[in-house]
C-alpha cells in the first residue's frame, strides 16, 4: 500500500552505499559513489490519491555520483548548507536547491560533451599513430579528423554560456532584484547600486567577470560569424612546421588559438568554481546573526564525496568550556 513504510534498495547490478539524498520537492535524488537515482513518491505520481496501489518508483539518471567533483561541489554542497539553514519544507530552500539542480544538469551536459570529444580525439590520434609509418607516395595512409567539429564547439560554448546565465539567476533566489540577468556585468551593476552590503558577492562577480565575458565572446563570435569581423575560428587536426601533428584548436580571429580539449576543460573547472563562489557569497547574505556560522574550506575532502566547503556552527570557547565541565 502507498502509505506503508518503504525502504529503498539499489538494483542488483549496482554496488556501493547510499551516500546522500536530496529532497527536491516532487522528487528525491539518491546518490551512491558512482550513480544518481531519481525516486518519485506515490503522492507525486497520484496526487489525488485515487489509487492506493500506486508504488514508489526510482530510475537511474546518471552514471556520475557523489564521488564526481562536479556533483559533489554543486548539488551536494548546496544541500548540506541549506539543510542547516532552512527546514526541509521551506519554500526558499526548495527554490534554491531546484535552481542548483538545474545548474548541475547543465554542467553535466557540458561534461558529457567534453568527454565525448576527448574520446574521439584519442581515437583519432591512436589511428594516426598506428598508421603514420604507412605512406602512399607522400600522403599519410590515415590523417585524423573530428567529424562535425563545429557542432562540437557549438555544444560546448552554448552550454558554458547557459551555465553562466543559470548561475546569474541563482542570485535571484537569495536576494530581491529588479530582473533576472543573463549577463554578469548587468547583475553586478544592479547589486552594486541596490545591495551595496553584499560585499562578498560583489567581489566574486568582479573577480570572475572577465572570464565570463570571454566565454560569452567565444560563443557570440561563433553565433554571429557571418556578420562580425572577428568570428570564431575552429581548426581541425592539422600539420604544422611541415610535419608536426596539431590537435584541434579554436579562438577568435586575430587572437591566439587554443587547443579545444585543454581550454574546454579549463572552462569546466572555472564554471564549477564560479558556482561555488557565487553560492557561498549568497549564503553569507542569509546567515543569521545568531547562532554564528562559519564557512570552512575542506583541505582533505573524502574520495567518495569530495565536497570542498562545509558550514559549521561557531561555538564560543567559553560556551564549550562550560559545557565540557558540566
Which residues fall in each region the model found?
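Eukaryotic low-complexity, intrinsically disordered regulatory regions enriched for acidic, serine-
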Residues: 152-156
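Short E/K-rich amphipathic alpha-helical oligomerization segments
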Residues: 126-136
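Hydrophobic faces of stable alpha-helices that mediate helix-helix packing
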Residues: 111, 118, 160-164
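Acidic, Ser/Thr/Gly/Pro-rich intrinsically disordered interaction regions
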Residues: 1-112, 134-151, 169-326
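Extended alpha-helical scaffold segments
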Residues: 114, 118-128
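Extended, well-ordered alpha-helical segments in internal regulatory regions
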Residues: 157-175
Amino acid at each position: 500500500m502507498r502509505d506503508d513504510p518503504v525502504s529503498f534498495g539499489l538494483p542488483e547490478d549496482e554496488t556501493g552505499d547510499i551516500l546522500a539524498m536530496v529532497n527536491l520537492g516532487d522528487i528525491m535524488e539518491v546518490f551512491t559513489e558512482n550513480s544518481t537515482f531519481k525516486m518519485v513518491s506515490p503522492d507525486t505520481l497520484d496526487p489525488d490519491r485515487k489509487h492506493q496501489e500506486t508504488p514508489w518508483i526510482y530510475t537511474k539518471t546518471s552514471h556520475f555520483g557523489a564521488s564526481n567533483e562536479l556533483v559533489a561541489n554543486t548539488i551536494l554542497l548546496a544541500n548540506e548548507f541549506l539543510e542547516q539553514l532552512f527546514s526541509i519544507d521551506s519554500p526558499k530552500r526548495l527554490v534554491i536547491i531546484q535552481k542548483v539542480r538545474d545548474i548541475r544538469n547543465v554542467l553535466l551536459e557540458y561534461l558529457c560533451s567534453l568527454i565525448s570529444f576527448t574520446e574521439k580525439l584519442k581515437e583519432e590520434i591512436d589511428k594516426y599513430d598506428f598508421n603514420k609509418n604507412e605512406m602512399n607516395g607522400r600522403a599519410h595512409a590515415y590523417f585524423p579528423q573530428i567529424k562535425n567539429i563545429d557542432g562540437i564547439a557549438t555544444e560546448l560554448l552554448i552550454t558554458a554560456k547557459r551555465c553562466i546565465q543559470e548561475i546569474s539567476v541563482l542570485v535571484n533566489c537569495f536576494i530581491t532584484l529588479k530582473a533576472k540577468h543573463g549577463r554578469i556585468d548587468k547583475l553586478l551593476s544592479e547589486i552594486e547600486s541596490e545591495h551595496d552590503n553584499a560585499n562578498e558577492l560583489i567581489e566574486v562577480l568582479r573577480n570572475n567577470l572577465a572570464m565570463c565575458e570571454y566565454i560569452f565572446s567565444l560563443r557570440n563570435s561563433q553565433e554571429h560569424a557571418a556578420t562580425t569581423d572577428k568570428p570564431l575560428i575552429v581548426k581541425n587536426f592539422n600539420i604544422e612546421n611541415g610535419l608536426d601533428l596539431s590537435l584541434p584548436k579554436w579562438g577568435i580571429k586575430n587572437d591566439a588559438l587554443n587547443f579545444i580539449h585543454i581550454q574546454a576543460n579549463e572552462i569546466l573547472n572555472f564554471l564549477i568554481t564560479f558556482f561555488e563562489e557565487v553560492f557561498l557569497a549568497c549564503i553569507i547574505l542569509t546567515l543569521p546573526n545568531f547562532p554564528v556560522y562559519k564557512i570552512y574550506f575542506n583541505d582533505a575532502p573524502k574520495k567518495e564525496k569530495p565536497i570542498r566547503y562545509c558550514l559549521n556552527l561557531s561555538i564560543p570557547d567559553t560556551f564549550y568550556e562550560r559545557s565540557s565541565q558540566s
